[in-house]
Amino acid sequence: MYRFAPSPTGDMHIGNLRAAIFNYICARQKNMDFILRIEDTDKARNIAGKEEEIKEILNLFGISWQHYYIQSENLKFHRQMALKLVSEKKAFACFCTEEELEAKKELAKKQGKAYRYDGTCEKLADIDVLECEKPFVIRLKKPTHTMKFTDFIKGELSFEPENIDSFVIMRTDKTPTYNFACAVDDMLENVTCIIRGEDHVSNTPKQEHIRASLGYNKAMTYAHLPIILNEEGVKMSKREAHSSVKWLLESGILPSAIANYLIMLGNKTPCEIFTLEEAIKWFDISKVSKAPARFDLKKLLQINREHIKMIKDDELNKILDLNKDLAQLAKFYTQEASTIKELKEKMRAIFNTKDFGEFETECKILKELLKDIELFENYEDFKNELLSKSDLKGKKFFMPLRIILTGNIHGPELSDLYPYIKNFIHELARI
């Protein structure tokens, strides 16, 4: 069983989407169920509407799930599991205040040591715990042995007990911490493989320790994906616009192109342009590079142009909101436009009223002739016919003709454009 477990606390990051895609692919390859779990226990940071937005984005990418869970609905199980650990003396109530802990952290810092919980409350007698009326958290006792696990990408990893420490699993408000809720939910939902970002590597031994302490002995496999760097080689921040999947989609980049790029990023693929369904046939999680991958927006835009060309004409007309068949013309313009947004602007420029500027007189002459000119099969015949009838030459012929046909003074060669725009010339002359 594979899962994708986002939090509804902001726009989906491309790193999260990459994890979703990889989990989905692996689930399909192994004919296993795929879980979508919304991790909403951090109520203060949750943003209204983001849960639905996550589902909408996954649907756009063709990612479906067989099971859907809301983490906060498992709260009673989290509390039951925490109580079980306390009753078995594997966890304990900690009454240390934030101020007391902060003072100990500062002391460790001055001494040049890494802070570790000193076990103050672990030593309390049961009667002292029962009689104490102070707010408390629940801490899980640190493991007694080295925690080891195998990662499909990073290989063998191990963590010593002192690096895991006695960590908090339940807060003072009786809600679970991230690691506890995540570990318990993965156990309850029978998750067998976790693919996520490498920023979660340090969480893995804690989650393994939680499940082991609860007596769960089913093996879990892992793959921690390397971080995505920006174009300057720095870890991509959520504040950078193109780290947001929503921003990429609103910019006119196709879901299929984004998926293509994220699968290819830091990975060896048999070809450069492919669909998600094609990738399912050959994708190998162990082939993903250990090294951080640098995000290249130009490369993504190049891939997007190729995916636009792959779209069926009737579908592209719908995507571009066109009421006529302009798909082939739009695909021709991918030499200049890289996104759906840019293609819409190109089509609007062609079929909207134009500004003739200094060529107003020449444009009027050409428009009259174009209203019923014979639409020759090749551009040279068309051009020569128009030249002879208009009596215009050079710049005063080609510039106004370009404006009438494209709405711009610069653009592709008219001879290249002609086959795609030929059938619309009479219409353009009447705008």
Swiss-Prot record:
GO cellular component terms, semicolon-separated: cytosol
InterPro entries in alphabetical order: aa-tRNA-synth_I_cd-bd, aa-tRNA-synth_I_codon-bd_sub2, aa-tRNA-synth_I_CS, aa_tRNA-synth_I_cd-bd_sf, Glu-tRNA-ligase_bac/mito, Glu/Gln-tRNA-synth, Glu/Gln-tRNA-synth_Ib_cat-dom, GluQ/Sye
Major location category of this protein: cytoplasm
Source species, domain of life: Bacteria
SUPFAM superfamilies: An anticodon-binding domain of class I aminoacyl-tRNA synthetases (SSF48163), Nucleotidylyl transferase (SSF52374)
Locus of motif 'KMSKS' region: 235-239
Motif window: 'HIGH' region: 6-16
Transmembrane segments: none
Binding site for ATP: K238
Top EC category: ligase
Localization of this protein: Cytoplasm
Family indicated by similarity: Belongs to the class-I aminoacyl-tRNA synthetase family. Glutamate--tRNA ligase type 1 subfamily.
PANTHER family in the record: GLUTAMATE--TRNA LIGASE, GLUTAMATE--TRNA LIGASE, MITOCHONDRIAL-RELATED
Biological role stated in the UniProt entry: Catalyzes the attachment of glutamate to tRNA(Glu) in a two-step reaction: glutamate is first activated by ATP to form Glu-AMP and then transferred to the acceptor end of tRNA(Glu).
Complex formation: Monomer.
Name of the featured protein: Glutamate--tRNA ligase 1
Organism: Campylobacter jejuni subsp. jejuni serotype O:23/36 (strain 81-176)
Phylogenetic placement of the source organism: Bacteria, Pseudomonadati, Campylobacterota, Epsilonproteobacteria, Campylobacterales
Annotated gene: gltX1
